[in-house]
Regions:
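Short inter-helical turns and helix N-cap capping residues of alpha-solenoid HEAT/ARM repeat scaffolds
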Residues: 22-23, 53-55
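Structural detector for internal amphipathic alpha-helices that build alpha-solenoid repeat scaffolds
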Residues: 1-5, 16, 25-39, 57-74
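Core helices of alpha-solenoid repeat scaffolds
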Residues: 7-11, 42
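Buried hydrophobic core positions in alpha-solenoid tandem helical repeats
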Residues: 13-15, 45-48
């Protein structure tokens, strides 16, 4: 069993924030927070924007964030 690193723990906490809130402002802020983790956060953001309960605006913001991370991680 591996010990989770700090990034994984933080990503889990931010994802929990999104799942426990239906507020688009909170969800968008959480995606922005995830973006600070760079590449490791892409899967988390993809999972979040794949939820049926997420608004179209948040999904669009998530897709833009993933694009930004990919373009700036090289």
């Amino acid at each position: 069993m591996s010990i989770p690193n700090k990034n994984e723990e933080a990503i889990t906490r931010v994802k929990h924030l999104v799942y426990s809130s239906s507020d688009a402002v909170v969800q968008t802020g959480a995606i922005d927070t995830l973006a600070t983790f760079g590449e490791p956060a892409i899967d988390a953001i993809s999972e979040i924007i794949g939820l049926s309960s997420i608004s179209d605006g948040v999904k669009e913001h998530g897709l833009k964030t993933i694009k930004y991370i990919k373009e700036n991680s090289r």
